[in-house]
Each structure stands twice: as C-alpha cells, then as structure tokens.
From Swiss-Prot:
Assembly and interaction partners: Homodimer.
Stated family: Belongs to the transketolase family. DXPS subfamily.
Function field: Catalyzes the acyloin condensation reaction between C atoms 2 and 3 of pyruvate and glyceraldehyde 3-phosphate to yield 1-deoxy-D-xylulose-5-phosphate (DXP).
SMART domains in alphabetical order: Transket_pyr (SM00861)
Protein known as: 1-deoxy-D-xylulose-5-phosphate synthase
Cellular compartments per GO CC: cytosol
Residues where Mg(2+) binds: D146, N175
Length: 636
C-alpha cells in the first residue's frame, strides 16, 4: 500500500482524506521531513512540532483563498509538502531548489514571505483588512511560534488586531522553545500552562457561573470582580483577552483530530481569536526532542539513526567559535565586559560565555531593539557590553544603533556574525547590508577581520575604544592561522599584505575575509606577468585613506572587493576617498566587486561568491580587464 502523502498534490486532495487517517499522514510527513533534513540540513525541530497544526489547517481552510501566514517560517515544511511541492521538497535549501522559508514567488499558497520573527500577526491583519476593503472572501490565519511572541512587533500587531476586532485567527504554537530556550518574564508566564481536565473544567464552571450571575446588587458585583480577579491569576489567556482577543486553549497541538474540530468551530467565529496549542519541538524524533539546547534548529547534515551531525573532515574552527573564545578571554580579564544576544546563545557562540559567566551574559529573547538600548544603558554606567547578533537581525535595531548608542558616543561593541553570504538560509538571512548601513553612522568604528587573529585583535581594540564599534565576520571556518595574543590595533590603519618591486599593474583592496581570494588572485596574475599589490584595509570606517590612496595612485588601477552590497558599501567608501584626493580626475581606473543590487538566493557559500563575482577567479578577471583596458587605451 502506498503512502497517503503521495496522493496529495494540493490542499484540495488533503480535504478528501478522512479525519481518521490524518494521524497516519502526519507520521508520513514527519518521516519525509526527517529524511530530507538529514541530507540537506534545515529547521527540523520546529517543523516536526507543527505537523498536526499544518495538516489540520489545510484540512479545514481553503488556501490560497484563505491566507495562512507563518511566522519565521521554520514551521512550514509540512505546509510545503501539502501544497504541490512534495516532489520538489527533496531540493529544499539547495541550489535551484525550494527555499527554506515561505516565499511568495514560489507558490500561491505562500501568502507572505518570512524569515525574521514576529511579523505574522501584523501581516495577517493587513491581509484581513484588505479583504474587508476589497470585499474579497476568505479567512486569514497567523501561525506564531518558535519564540516569536518574545518580539515586540507581535504584540504591536495583537494590539491593533484586538482594537479593530476583525475575524483574525492567531494560532500560538507554544513549544516552550525558540532557537534558544525562551527567556523573560512573559515567556515564564506562558509556560505556566493548565492543560489538565481539572483546570479546563474549573475554567468552564467559572465562565458559566459568571454568565449566570446578574449585574446589579453590590454584593453580587463584588463576587463577580473577585472571581474575575482569581481567573486572571490562573488563566494563561488573560493577557490576550485584555488585548481584545477571544482566547481558546490550551489545546493539544498534536491531536490532529481535535485540531480539525477546533478549527472548524473557529472558522465561523466572529472576531479575533487566539488558539493556544501546546506542542513539542522535534515531536516524533527522539534526538530532536531530547536536544534541550536547540531541539533540531538549523541543523546541518546528520545521521537519521542517531541524530548526530555527519562529521566533516577536520578543519579550522568556525569564526563563531573563535569569537566566543576570544570574548570569554576578555570577560576573564575585565569584569566590566558583558555579553548580550537576542535569542541566539548557540548561534552566536555565547553559550560558552553563559556557561562561564552566567551573571554577565544576557539572552533578551527576540528583542533586538531592546538588546541595543539595554546595552546603551549598561554602557552609561561604565559597563563594556558586547552585543553579539546576526548581521541580518541587527537591521531590526537600526534606530537604536543611531539614536541610543552612536549619538551618545557610548562604548558598545557590536559583533556581527554571519556577515556576508550565508549559504542555504538564503535571501532572508544574507548579511549583505551591514557595511553600508553602519559606515554612514557618525562616530561608529567599523571593522572587518580577514582571519582569526584579526578578529581577536579587533574585539580587543573595540573594548579599549571609548566609543561605539562594530566588527563583522562570516559564517563558516576561519583560515586556520596560528593564534596570537590579542592586541590593540591603531584605529583607521590598514596594512599592505602583498607588495611588488617597482610599479605594480594593479592594486587590490580587499575588505574582511575576501583577502584570501584577493591573494590567490594576485598569485594567479603573477604567473601571467601581471603585478598586483594587495591591501587589507582592516577598517571600513575610518578608512586608511593614506595607505589605500597611495597604493591606488602607485598602480593607477585599483580593484575593491567586499562581501557586502556594492551600493554604499566599502567600495563606495574608497571611491569617496579617491574623489576627495583628486585621483579620479587624475585618471585612476577603478573596479568595484561586491554583492549587486539584488537578493541572493540559497546555495553553497562558494557558489554564491562565484555568482556575485568575489571569488579568486572573478577578482583576477576584473584585474585583467582593468589592466588590459587601460593598456589598450594607452594609459600607463
């Protein structure tokens, strides 16, 4: 007998499956997700925990007329399997394959593109309001989970949704875990769930009693207020009810039959509703369920039988790990240094700091804006905070960087992990914009280390600097250099790492870890008789104009390289310096290499670098073209 899953090419097919067979279908979906994630990596735990929610939603609602909006998108693997992408699912997160997150261009069933947390409620509210304006039929459901309720924007959406009173359904997928364990008083309050029959019976009895008691006599009003106060102490939904939502739950998020029945009732409910579903992250796969740290979040390749990662050949440590070790050294030597992250203890490596310095390491939840202003407050009182955060997520706190940190010249260090191209996570997670959006902030020092030692030196430098500073480093392994003791670098001073005797044909100025590719390109060019010097600028801001402009003028041709967006980035900073010093008018030939004006899709990092033209071959080709073009025009 074949799989039920193989008979489903659309949500319409799913509706034909009897409710009694849905548990078997859920098991098949889990097996498919596990097998695929083992080969491709991905967000295993969240997707396994939300299988029944996915199946029940598609069994009751009619996508794409009814809009299903997934917060973050980690929970949506089953959604992809049920919406005509079963065969293509094996390609998820691979070059040319399905994206790891919902994307509007990929399917009409992906109502909203996601990747960053806490956005679903606001987007869903916009959709239901648009339906009201246009008269278009259909329901809208926002599925919120994976810690997204620790993000302030989720409550901003809830606040307006309750005020407007539209027929919006919010499903709170409560698995007690974000990427790191949920933190904060609000999360702790959520965790005090009452799923027992005793609690639910008591809740029904209180509700029935309150409805039966008439208003009027003072004594009865006192009773009503007293019982309502008691209810407020023990009902998990009181916060949502206070925001204008009808609260339902908690319910078992793995009882697919019960969920179908509940969704059928809620589909005809008038007004905003929040359904509180209790799930287990990694449900049905013991290694993911038992992983208390991440429960299968963002896994690479793993062995299905054990859940253990498939070991790669030994290589250099990841920049994330090197940063974490360097930070722990700084915290060991300076008690003023503290570490802050936004729900990414494992991802940023700060779990090491948390283990060694639990009272000086803060996980603030998915609250990047708060993280930055919290750091600013600490810095005001003499503390040296280090905010470790993915480059793509720091975008969410841009106003706080400018207004709360830079404007006040506070000594906050921003450690930007995943700077540049990130590989399989794709468009929503590329760290493409940080150099551009940080270098325009007055007084902010911006550094890009080219190897592990440079990272150590730059972290140490930032902690001695009496002002704000940022260092950004890529995803993946370092260069494998022998480590040196950390030392203070002179701010705004780069280094000439490859010189040539006499007059060079071209100068390559390579920011950050593009230096390795630039040096390889220079070696290849040397074999062809083209002499190239190579500069490591170290600082994107303040730029070492003396060194860069001197080497550019010496060669009369310069190629800038960065793993960041070309618009407003490092190459633009160099152009501004060349203009200030009259080099452009003097005939300097310039080529800028970096990420073009587009969102780069998912693939291996090496392939992405080749796509955008910043690998060694592309750098060498740009140098050849510049040298050849200049010589062809008779320019020395």
């Amino acid at each position: 007998m074949g799989r039920l899953l193989d008979t489903i090419d659309s949500p319409t097919d799913l509706k034909k499956v009897p409710v009694e067979q849905l548990p078997a279908l859920c098991q098949e979906i889990r097996e498919q997700i596990i097998q695929t994630c083992a080969r491709n990596g991905g967000h295993l735990g969240s997707s396994l925990g939300a299988v029944e929610i996915n199946v029940a939603l598609h069994h009751v609602f009619s996508s794409p007329q009814d809009k299903l909006v997934w917060d973050v998108g980690h929970q949506a693997y089953a959604h992809k399997l049920l919406t005509g992408r079963r065969e293509a699912f094996r390609t998820i997160r691979t070059e040319g394959g399905l994206a790891g997150f919902p994307e509007r261009h990929e399917s009409a069933h992906d109502a909203f593109g996601v990747g960053h947390a806490s956005t679903a409620i606001s987007a869903a509210l916009g959709m239901i309001e648009a339906k009201r304006v246009t008269g278009e039929p259909g329901k809208v459901v926002a599925v919120v989970g994976d810690g997204a309720m620790t993000g302030g924007v989720a409550f901003e959406g809830l606040n307006q949704a309750g005020y407007l009173g539209r027929n919006l359904l919010v499903v709170l997928n409560d698995n007690e875990m974000s990427i790191s364990p949920n933190v904060g008083a609000l999360s702790e309050w959520f965790s005090k769930k009452f799923a027992s029959r005793t609690y639910n019976r008591w809740r029904r009895q209180v509700k029935e009693f309150l409805e039966s008691v008439p208003k009027g006599p003072e004594a009865i009003e006192i009773i009503r207020h007293g019982i309502n106060a008691t209810k407020a102490l023990v009902t998990p939904g009181i916060l949502f009810e206070g925001l204008g939502f009808h609260y339902v739950g908690p319910v078992d998020g793995h009882d697919v039959k019960g969920l179908v029945e509940t969704f059928q009732k809620l589909a005809i409910f008038d007004g905003p509703v929040l359904l509180h579903a209790i799930t287990t992250k990694g449900k049905g796969y013991h290694p993911a369920e038992s992983d208390k740290a991440t429960r299968g979040h963002g896994l690479s390749f793993f062995d299905v039988a054990t859940g253990k990662p498939v070991k790669k050949s030994p290589g250099a440590k990841a920049y994330t790990d090197l940063f974490a070790e360097a930070l722990c050294e700084e915290m060991e030597h300076d008690p003023r240094v503290v570490a802050i992250t936004a729900a990414m203890l494992e991802g940023t490596g700060l779990i090491k700091a948390k283990q060694r310095f639990p009272d000086r390491t803060y996980d603030v939840g998915i609250a990047e804006q708060h993280a930055v202003t919290f750091a600013a407050g600490l810095a005001c009182e003499g503390i040296r905070p280090v905010v470790a955060i993915y480059s793509t997520f720091l975008q969410r706190a841009y106003d706080q960087i400018i207004h709360d940190v830079a404007l006040q010249k506070l000594p906050v260090t921003f450690a930007l992990d995943r700077g540049g191209l990130v590989g399989a996570d794709g468009k929503t997670h590329q760290g493409a914009f940080d150099l551009a959006y940080l270098r325009c902030v007055p007084g902010l020092v911006v550094m890009a280390p080219s190897d592990e030692n440079e990272l150590r030196h730059m972290l140490h430098t930032s902690l001695q600097h009496e002002g704000p500073a940022a260092l950004r480093y890529p995803r993946g392994a370092g260069e494998g250099v022998a480590l040196e003791p950390a030392r203070v670098l002179e701010i705004g001073k780069g280094r000439l790492v490859r010189n040539v005797p006499g007059k060079p044909d071209v100068c390559v100025v390579a920011a950050g870890t593009t230096l390795k590719a630039a040096l390889a390109a220079a070696e290849a060019l040397a074999a062809e008789g083209v002499a190239a010097t190579v500069v490591d600028p170290r600082f994107v801001k303040p730029l070492d104009e003396e060194l860069i402009c001197a080497e550019a003028a010496r060669a009369k041709r310069v190629v800038t390289v960065e793993e960041g967006c070309l618009a407003g980035g490092f190459g633009t900073a160099c152009l501004e310096a060349f203009e200030r010093r009259g080099l452009l008018e003097a005939g300097l030939g310039v080529r800028r290499l970096g990420i073009p004006d587009e969102f780069i899709t998912h693939a291996e990092q090496a392939k992405q670098r080749a796509w955008v033209g910043i690998d060694a071959d592309a750098i060498a080709a740009a140098c050849r073209a510049l040298v050849g073009d200049r010589k062809a025009r008779g320019v020395a």
